């Protein structure tokens, strides 16, 4: 049985960048619905490891709801209140970003462009091999995601309406770079 993870911060902790009402609905309604629907769909015979299940199943409803649960569970970990966020990548992560993208600003520009270019609902990811990947709907990226941005409208519409660019700019203020570094290092 899959469970809704608790947020690693209070629902108001990401203000003013991501508002309380959005967090309450995003986590407590959208993510909770993915978990409930997934539990209604899986059987005792199904793979218990969610990532493996999503990679092997042909059941589109399991992929949609399981992907929603998996992606959001990662997403919450990758966020932190602005006061707790280091504000930028450091250490090995920063070295790899600099080597791949020239510098942190170059990475942010490319990641933001991918997020703005994602037509419709989906996600943008940075994978462990430092590839920026956008996926439709609740699909998982190829590779191991270390940073993800939800660009479904439910993630930002209450505060930002149709201004996805403003949401993305605000989101950079609450990225939990320490968590991204720990995922990269495999110490999650």
Segments (PLM) and residue ranges:
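Protein-protein interaction regions
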Residues: 179-182, 187-188
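Acidic, low-complexity proline/glycine-rich segments
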Residues: 1-10
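Secretory/endomembrane lumenal or extracellular ectodomains immediately following the signal peptide
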Residues: 12-14
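Conserved, well-structured core segments that form or line functional sites
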Residues: 81-82, 91-121, 129
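Short Gly/Ser/Thr- and charged-rich N-terminal loops/segments
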Residues: 87
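Alpha-helical scaffold segments that form or flank carboxylate-/histidine-based iron centers
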Residues: 16-32, 50-71, 137-150
């Amino acid at each position: 049985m899959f469970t809704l993870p608790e947020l690693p911060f209070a629902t108001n902790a990401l203000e003013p960048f991501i508002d309380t009402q959005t967090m309450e609905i995003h986590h407590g309604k959208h993510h909770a619905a993915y978990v409930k629907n997934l539990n209604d769909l899986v059987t005792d015979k199904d793979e218990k490891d969610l990532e493996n299940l999503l990679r092997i199943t042909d059941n589109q409803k399991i992929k949609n709801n399981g992907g929603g649960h998996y992606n959001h569970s990662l997403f919450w970990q990758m966020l932190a209140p602005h006061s707790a966020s280091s504000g930028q990548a450091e250490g090995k992560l920063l070295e790899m970003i600099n080597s791949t993208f020239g510098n942190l600003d170059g990475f942010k520009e490319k990641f933001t462009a991918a997020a703005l270019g994602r037509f419709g609902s989906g996600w943008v990811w940075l994978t462990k091999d430092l590839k920026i990947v956008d996926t439709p709907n609740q699909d998982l990226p190829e590779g191991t995601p270390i940073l993800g941005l939800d660009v479904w409208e439910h993630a930002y519409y209450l505060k930002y309406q149709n201004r996805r660019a403003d949401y993305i700019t605000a989101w950079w203020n609450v990225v939990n770079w320490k968590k991204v570094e720990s995922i990269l290092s495999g110490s999650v």
